[in-house]
Swiss-Prot record:
Entry protein name: Small ribosomal subunit protein uS15
Keyword entries, A-Z: Ribonucleoprotein, Ribosomal protein, RNA-binding, rRNA-binding
Subunit structure: Part of the 30S ribosomal subunit. Forms a bridge to the 50S subunit in the 70S ribosome, contacting the 23S rRNA.
Cellular-component GO terms for this entry: cytosolic small ribosomal subunit
GO biological process, alphabetically ordered: translation
The species this protein was found in: Burkholderia mallei (strain ATCC 23344)
A Pfam family matched in the record: Ribosomal_S15
Annotated transmembrane regions: none
Length: 89
């Protein structure tokens, strides 16, 4: 397994609701947050990488949509996820 696969499985294991859960909103948001965090570090050294910045904005938008869905579906799970990921200040 590559480092990315190992990190991905750790995130899935941490946020999964069940044994084989990979598609719940919590897992999807956690994976997107991990990728967003990595890309944010990338932009500190490569400020003019506009192509990747567009991908970052798509990921942020997708995460926002998933969070809005979860907030409407189950507010308690939404608040727990936000606190666990440390997204809202």
């Amino acid at each position: 397994m590559s480092v990315a696969d190992i990190k991905k499985s750790e995130v899935v294991a941490q946020f999964a609701r069940g044994a084989n859960d990979t598609g719940s909103p919590e897992v999807q948001v956690a994976l997107l947050t991990a990728r967003i965090t990595e890309l944010t570090g990338h932009f500190k050294t490569h400020a003019k990488d506009h192509h990747s910045r567009r991908g970052l904005l798509r990921m942020v938008s997708r995460r926002r949509k998933l969070l809005d869905y979860l907030k409407g579906k189950d507010a308690d799970r939404y608040r727990a996820l936000i606190e666990k990921l440390g997204l809202r200040k």
